[in-house]
A protein has these predicted regions:
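Glycine-rich phosphate-binding loops of nucleotide-dependent enzymes
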Residues: 1-3, 7-227
């Protein structure tokens, strides 16, 4: 589905990402984790078209999408949510959803129910809590035509209730055959829901495997947890 091969990026003299290679398999939840400064956000931005890679290739379903502009990435089939939400806070829930797709009342209500956002469609987005705004952004991303759903730090700033709801939402999407790529800092969260976990540190992939293998890996414990 998604393939990164030898992707590298420098900012001045700093190596943000160095020869990063991994794959996100179809119909899986794959999570990219690591400590602050590991390079996760840079990988997300490069894959989203927000930052240009210095070298390497990125492919989606076999098609080269390396260094395409963000709207071209979306057209290729990647739908995204961001750590800092990109919803329009001055617009209603309905209008935010209509930006993603011209749809009808029933489809919008069904989508909101699927992400546990039980609010009237005419509610202004600024009246929602931060966690509810994250859910609205997720609903909007799901409405867009896509083959890959990519989420940047979906648990950041949300309360325990929404955090648990996110687990259920992602599990349900997985059962529906969705392909999901998470960028996360919360190891416990991804351990519960991921088919595969990729661990980064200092710009490099240091471990890739099933949650049970990652949890026991000594290098991961040393680098990520400081043990």
């Amino acid at each position: 589905m998604l393939s990164l091969k030898n992707v590298s990026k420098r900012f001045g003299g700093i190596k943000a990402v160095e020869r990063c290679s991994f794959e996100v398999e179809e119909n899986t939840i794959t999570s990219l984790i690591g400590p602050n400064g590991a390079g996760k956000t840079t990988v997300f931005n490069i894959t989203s078209g927000l930052t240009r890679a210095d070298s390497g290739t990125i492919k989606l379903s076999g098609n080269d999408i390396t260094n395409r502009l963000p709207y071209k990435i979306a057209q290729a089939g990647i739908s995204r949510t961001f750590q800092l939400t990109k919803i329009f806070k001055n617009l209603s829930i309905k209008d935010n959803l209509l930006i993603a797709k011209k749809t009808n009342y029933d489809e919008m209500k069904k989508m909101l129910e699927s992400v546990y956002l039980h609010k009237p469609l005419d509610t202004i987005a600024s009246e929602l809590s931060y966690g509810q705004q994250r859910l609205l952004e997720l609903a909007r991303a799901l409405l867009k035509p896509h083959s890959l759903l990519m989420l940047d730090e979906p648990t950041a700033g949300v309360n325990p209730k929404i955090r648990q709801e996110l687990k259920t939402i992602l599990r349900n999407l997985r059962k529906e055959g969705k392909t999901i790529f998470l960028i996360e800092h919360d190891m416990d969260f991804v351990m519960d829901i991921s088919d595969e976990i990729i661990v980064m540190a200092e710009g490099k992939v240091i471990k890739r495997g099933k949650p049970s293998a990652v949890r026991k890996d000594r290098k991961v414990l040393e680098v990520y947890l400081g043990k």
